[in-house]
Amino acid sequence: MAFLSIPSPRRWAALLSLSLGPILGAADATSNSAADYYVRDLPGLPKDGPNIKMHAGHIEVTPESHGNLFFWHFENQHIADKQRTVIWINGGPGCSSEDGAMMEIGPYRLKDKENLYYNNGSWGEFANLLFVDNPVGTGYSLVDTNAYVKELDEMADQFIQFLEKWFALFPQYDRDDIYIAGESYAGQHIPYIAKAILDRNKKNPSKAWNLQGLLIGNGWISPVDQYPAYISFAHEKGIIEKGSDNDKKLQSALRGCERVIASSPGRVDYGECEEILKNILELTRDGNKCINMYDVRLTDTYPSCGMNWPPDLEYLTPYLGRKDVVDALHVTSMKSTGWKECSGAVGGAFTARNSKPAVELLPDLLKEVPVLLFSGAEDFICNHLGTEELISKLEWNGGKGFEVTPGNWAPRRDWTFEGETAGFWQEARNLTYVLIYNSSHMVPFDLPRRSRDMLDRFMGVDISNIGGDPTDSRIDGEKGPETTVGGASNKTQSAAQDHQKQLDEAKWAAYQKSGEVVLVIVIIAAIAWGYFVWRERRKGAAYHALANHDNNSHSNGFRAKSQPGDLESAAFDESELDDLHGSTPATATSARFPVNRNDTREKFVTKYAEPSS
């Protein structure tokens, strides 16, 4: 028979302190700590243009190895029909998402090393933007050098830890429609993160995150389909002539690649297959000039071949290294190596030897989440032919590729933007593919407003309730819903609506938290009251027994029934940001990022790496 052990009255104060302290402390730390991330004055901000609220800093994900992910959050300019958040991650692996923030979809771009200007094509018009340097050690993120991430599952688990803590800090966003976007090797990251979110939601449906879509630009998704596309793309662009001696050399390299894949299937990358692109760049060099592998319309010095692109890198690296910028973004001094666009050490450690390629996750993801794959037509390294090939072979939601009925394929619908041919759209069974003409590996860098129009269409943005002048964007000549706006016509009213909705969301989150804390207080108070009554009655019974010990009258018995309460339930587990401690030694250059021995800079990365200075 089990008995409930009840503490003595003098221990109730201590029990209350121990039980409520972590809960109330976490709630207070969450609300107070959010202010610590507020970016009060980013150096070089333009005097004109919207005033955009920002938060930035580190969140610890692996305390045992001092692993922290750096984030930079920009609040949306307007709320259309609902609140949305786009999470952006760049590729590499090991390349910083500040590329996306400062050169692609963020609200500001660099005019020079000192000054910013407003990006009129920012994806933040109708969505909050959350940029994350992922995995640990990338960009401003940090970790001990012996604890770099090696596998995609490990990366996704750490990202979930980050999101749990981030939403605890900023609960006003945890009911947003969430979209995850990125490019290049993010074609591996994003499906794994999405799967981890969906798995989490199934385990805790009452606190599910509202994942509404994935966007992958020029992604490295399916090696078996994308390696051969190097040669196909070189033929299409006239870089390599079919049947030429150079073509024969490349075909021989491709056969070797295919033998390795056949003998060891299901890997994310193959060193032997990397040689195909490297050989194309070497065979087509003209003196010290070579093709820019991120934009074949351009050239670069050999062996960089695109690593000096885009030109904004000339300003970005020194800007993010400035002390006033580092301080404004709350970057810890423990990031001793400073900001670097791509980390060879992170990329070299991320072997993913036990991870299957993300293409194998897409069929199940497409059952639950819409996916948009978009390709810049002039990118070589993750070119559109490889993406189109993987789609044609992919089986999902009862069909194969874009075949809608036997022998009938979903049409490629012409897309025009402000009177110019922009590309085409193709979609079926929850998958959308967009080819964007006149654009590179980094589509939003080249065509920010078109890329935002693509985003708004995919998210189903409805601007009818805020006014403004929509762009002239048409699919097959039909304008359809007005999705993109250059600026709200009634900015005061729009800003007021935005602010009120933010307040409402924050209030709801606060009410929910307060209700949880009050519930715990009520439970503890009830237990205390019950214990008090039990003690008083027991004292009364003892008094009766002593006073009437010769009187054989009846005696009263008491049975305390109690159901133990979980005072530290997961419902209250919203832990504050752990303190940063420990430094991160400087990282070494990885063998996967070969260098010119006469030049200390990284010169060549694998097919999925982002450009580096």
Curated annotation (Swiss-Prot):
It is a single-pass type I membrane protein. Residues 535-613 are cytoplasmic. GO terms for molecular function: serine-type carboxypeptidase activity. Residues 466-499, 569-597 are annotated as: Disordered. The keyword Plastid does not apply. The chain crosses the membrane at residues 514-534. Its EC number is 3.4.16.6. It catalyses: Preferential release of a C-terminal arginine or lysine residue. Keywords: Apoptosis, Carboxypeptidase, Glycoprotein, Golgi apparatus, Hydrolase, Membrane, Protease, Signal, Transmembrane, Transmembrane helix. The active site is at 184, 379, 441. Residues 486-497 have a biased composition (Polar residues). Its main location: Golgi. The keyword NAD does not apply. Residues 28-513 are lumenal. Residues 471-481 have a biased composition (Basic and acidic residues). Belongs to the peptidase S10 family. This is Pheromone-processing carboxypeptidase KEX1. The lineage of its organism: Eukaryota, Fungi, Dikarya, Ascomycota, Pezizomycotina.
